[in-house]
């Protein structure tokens, strides 16, 4: 077990070193509105940390919470409307599309990531994200690096996330 853990830690260190010299760090928001609240990962959460490790600026990085933070749509929009990327997780039979996202909540279309088609989704009904990623953060980090910095990790195929289709 120690050997496996050490190998994963080395993979993570190597991936972080890959993005460390980059001068550009794209911004990212995550998740979706659920009822009256949009639950975002706190700035001290594992998600926030892995976004930073992947060379991105998480728009709520300055938040002091380590868990989910319920926010009003307007708060997320104010801070995240110009984010370069948007990562969502959902569970449904077919993959989510831009059309469906717009039908779910029309104000989503105001986000730059929506307009520029830079939304990536993880369909947890098809992908073992919650079962796999806690034990393989190196795999998740690799996905995020490929999303945020597409010229890196040439030939790598995303494991958890896919770019939303129209």
Predicted region positions:
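Single conserved hydrophobic/aromatic residue that forms the stacking wall/gate
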Residues: 1-12
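Short secondary-structure boundary/capping segments
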Residues: 2, 20, 110-111
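Structured C-terminal subdomain patch of bacterial secreted/periplasmic proteins
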Residues: 6, 88-166
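Flexible, glycine-rich surface segments
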Residues: 13-98
């Amino acid at each position: 077990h120690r050997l496996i853990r050490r190998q994963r830690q080395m993979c993570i260190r190597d991936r972080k070193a890959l993005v460390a010299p980059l001068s550009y760090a794209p911004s990212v928001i995550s998740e979706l509105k659920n009822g009256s609240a949009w639950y975002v990962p706190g700035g001290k959460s594992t998600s926030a940390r892995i976004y930073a490790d992947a060379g991105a600026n998480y728009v709520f990085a300055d938040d002091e919470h380590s868990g989910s933070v319920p926010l009003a749509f307007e708060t997320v929009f104010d801070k995240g409307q110009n984010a370069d990327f948007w990562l969502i997780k959902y569970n449904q039979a077919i993959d989510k599309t831009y059309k469906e996202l717009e039908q779910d909540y029309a104000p989503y279309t105001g986000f730059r990531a929506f307009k520029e088609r830079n939304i990536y989704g993880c369909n947890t009904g098809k992908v073992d994200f919650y079962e796999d990623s806690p034990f393989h953060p190196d795999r998740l980090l690799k996905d995020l690096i490929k999303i945020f910095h597409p010229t890196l990790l040439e030939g790598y195929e995303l494991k958890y996330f896919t770019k939303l289709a129209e």
